[in-house]
A protein has these predicted regions:
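Active-/binding-site microenvironments in catalytic and ligand-binding cores
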Residues: 1-199
Length: 199
């Protein structure tokens, strides 16, 4: 079994423009004579590697603690793509995955500097998939991500953003990207990993 950590380190992570940076504060320090070390931290729900719940862009949408965990845990497919993902590209990815492993078609991770278009978002949304992941801090065009988010989240497709797939080849894996159990939250950081039977 081989485990790929596809998460960013939180305090050195990439942050979407305008979002606050993660911060940590040492409240107690054994080095300073305290009995124990104790750290407090503050961060945005969408810092680093994180999931977007429908509530992020859909008024009345599901919060992160209301989403079934099987959306984040199960067979997944890593597809490499660079540039804009067209509707035809999305359809081709889905067709290829369904032939290899129909269960993996429910969770697709896009490797590369891909930008999901509104047209491809509609194709993914219509496929009844659970999760779409990408390496960028936002799944849509960086200067106008709202429409793509609304299409996908409105269809109940959760988003896994800010993953790191440089060490991962295309193919089928087991994904665990469970979010923290944050009541009423529109998103959550997660420690996303891919697992394969190969060593």
């Amino acid at each position: 079994m081989k485990i790929y950590d596809i998460s960013q380190e939180v305090f050195g992570c990439q942050v979407y423009a305008g979002d606050p940076m993660p911060e940590k504060e040492l409240l107690s320090s054994m080095e300073n004579g305290d009995l124990y070390n104790l750290t407090a931290f503050r961060m945005c729900a969408h810092n680093g590697t994180h999931v977007d719940a429908p509530l992020h862009f859909i008024q009345g949408g599901k919060a992160v603690d209301s989403i079934d965990l099987d959306a984040f845990i199960g067979m997944a497919y890593v597809a490499e793509h660079h540039g804009i993902v067209s509707a035809d590209d999305a359809a081709a990815i889905l067709e290829k995955v369904k032939k290899q492993n129909p269960e993996a078609a429910k969770r697709i991770l896009i490797k590369g500097d891909a930008e999901v278009s509104s047209e491809s978002a509609k194709v993914f949304a219509a496929s009844n998939m659970f999760l779409l992941g990408n390496e960028s801090q936002t799944v849509g065009p960086p200067n106008a991500p709202m429409e793509v988010h609304r299409i996908l989240l409105g269809a109940g497709v959760v988003l896994l953003e800010g993953i790191r797939l440089a060490e991962v080849s295309q193919g089928v894996y087991f994904l665990n990207a469970a979010p923290l159990n944050l009541s009423g939250a529109d998103g959550s950081p997660c420690r996303a990993v891919l697992i394969t039977a190969e060593r």
